[in-house]
From Swiss-Prot:
Radical SAM core domain segment(s): 132-363
InterPro entries named in the record: Elp3/MiaA/NifB-like_rSAM, Methylthiotransferase, Methylthiotransferase_CS, Methylthiotransferase_N, Methylthiotransferase_N_sf, Ribosomal_uS12_MeSTrfase_RimO, rSAM, rSAM_horseshoe
Family: Belongs to the methylthiotransferase family. RimO subfamily.
MF terms (GO), sorted A to Z: 4 iron, 4 sulfur cluster binding; aspartic acid methylthiotransferase activity; metal ion binding; protein methylthiotransferase activity
Disulfides per UniProt: none
Catalyzed chemical reaction(s): L-aspartate(89)-[ribosomal protein uS12]-hydrogen + (sulfur carrier)-SH + AH2 + 2 S-adenosyl-L-methionine = 3-methylsulfanyl-L-aspartate(89)-[ribosomal protein uS12]-hydrogen + (sulfur carrier)-H + 5'-deoxyadenosine + L-methionine + A + S-adenosyl-L-homocysteine + 2 H(+)
UniProt protein name: Ribosomal protein uS12 methylthiotransferase RimO
GO biological process: tRNA modification
Subcellular locations according to the entry: Cytoplasm
Length: 439
């Protein structure tokens, strides 16, 4: 049997595409050593400069490691965005494809031909997919592309306009996954709260939530990547009212200064953002994640100081911060740029603030009882079982270390009520109190 090595870079949306490619290539034996693979695939990220460099380095590293007569395939956002340049500059690569042909990857490899469809790939309920990394959780991609016009973002230039999956397609995929034992789902897209806007339906997510709640066997769900102008008050209230969807609110704000929100073409002012955030924060056991960009063209010292004060005071649970990345095909590309030294200085300042805010979020968990899902072996060694707070993103929000149990041996994928005993440098030490369900 031929062996396959697949490297998925970037976001969880890329991961879903990688899992679909794995489904199409199920005849191959997966291996974790590039030097032994007959086919090597890199699913690239092309979002910002650091991600582009990571993708290029990964391609070159795999070329160095691969065996003679193997096939190196490059796909994904970077390839779609810089198709002509990369095909000229990467003779190390055997086959190229973009973001439209994930379900034809097997055909492409068989025929040893490049493929570039004119449209972005949109998953269907019939898409074969091999879930990776969990026996209980899966990401569900509900749409592709984006209709927003943020000044700094090039995603619409290579992902295209918003294209929503039909609700029936999503429900069919969920039912299949539940039948296979998956019970925990994270709904994702470039802009989840714009779901079905392209079909003329506002608040389409509310209807999706209604349908998801009818499926027996789903124990938890969360929605990632809400957008400030497309996430309505009605949607937030519907999430809060749900018995299945967790009060996990992931809304990248990018800034809080009205001046910068206007320059960045975010479509909402600070008053609107704060109203939305306060509604989210009022929900029982709410968990708020956001992201900010510093050093965008037009950002003054006053704008930056306003952002820092807001980050200090609001009380987010998790925050990602990024230095502005100058990207082609964006409105900000031709604006007067903030000097690199200033950007880097601001990034260091806000990173320190964010670190303190996140530390407080972890610290306030001590003494609480939380529902957690066991995820397997811990990064801290054999004496701990790793788990995630059921509210958290499955990849990035942290780790819980269970070293005591009042309910016997713990099972991977199972939910337990735990008491949080201690904060150990952004990892929570916990004791398992009881098994929550027998599923």
């Amino acid at each position: 049997m031929s062996k396959l090595y697949l490297m998925s870079l970037g976001c969880n949306k890329n991961l879903v595409d990688s899992e679909i490619m794995l489904g199409r290539l199920s005849a191959y034996e997966l291996c974790d050593e590039p030097s032994k693979a007959d086919v090597l695939i890199v699913n690239t990220c092309g979002f910002i400069d650091s991600a582009k460099k990571e993708s290029i380095n990964a391609i070159l590293d795999l070329h160095e490691q691969r065996k003679k007569d193997s096939l190196l395939v490059v796909t994904g956002c970077l390839m779609q965005r810089y198709r002509e340049e990369l095909m000229k500059e990467l003779p190390e690569v055997d086959l190229f494809t973009g973001v439209g042909d994930y379900e034809r990857i097997d055909e492409m490899i068989l025929k040893k031909t490049n493929l570039f469809s004119n449209s972005t790939y949109l998953q269907s309920e019939n898409s074969k997919r091999i879930i990776t990394g969990s026996n209980s959780h899966a990401f569900i991609k509900i749409a592709e592309g984006c209709n927003q016009k943020c000044s700094f973002c090039a995603i619409p230039s290579f992902k295209g306009k918003l294209k929503s999956r039909e609700i029936s397609s999503i429900i069919a995929e969920l039912k299949d996954l539940v039948a296979r034992g998956y019970k925990d789902f994270s709904f994702i897209a470039q802009d989840t709260s714009s779901y079905l806007f392209d079909k003329g339906e506002k608040d389409g997510l509310i209807r999706l939530i209604d349908e998801v709640e009818k499926i027996k066997g789903i124990r938890a769900a969360r929605i990632l990547y809400l957008y400030p102008t497309s996430a309505s008050e009605a949607l937030i209230k519907r999430i809060i009212a749900s018995e299945i969807f967790i009060n996990y609110f992931d809304m990248p704000l990018q800034h809080i200064s009205d001046n910068m929100l206007k320059i960045m073409k975010r479509g909402a002012n600070s008053t609107r953002l704060k109203e939305m955030l306060n509604l989210m924060k009022s929900a029982p056991n709410s968990f708020l994640r956001t992201g900010f960009i510093v050093g965008h063209p037009g950002e003054s010292e006053a704008d930056f100081e306003e952002l820092c004060e807001f980050v200090k005071d609001f009380g987010f649970d998790r925050i990602s911060v990024f230095a502005y990345s100058k990207e082609e095909d964006t409105a900000a590309f031709d604006m007067e740029q903030v000097p690199f030294k200033v950007i880097n200085k601001r990034l260091k300042i806000i990173e320190k603030i964010v670190d303190e805010v996140i530390e407080k979020s972890f610290e306030k968990e001590v003494g609480q009882k939380r529902l957690v899902v066991c995820t397997g072996k811990s990064s801290e060694g054999e004496f701990f079982i790793a788990a995630k707070d059921l509210r958290w993103d499955r990849e990035i929000d942290g780790e819980i270390l269970i070293n005591e149990s009042e309910c016997g041996n713990l099972e991977m994928g199972q939910i337990y009520e735990c008491e949080i005993l201690q904060n150990l440098d952004k990892k929570l030490l916990a004791k398992a109190l009881r098994k929550v369900d027998a599923n």
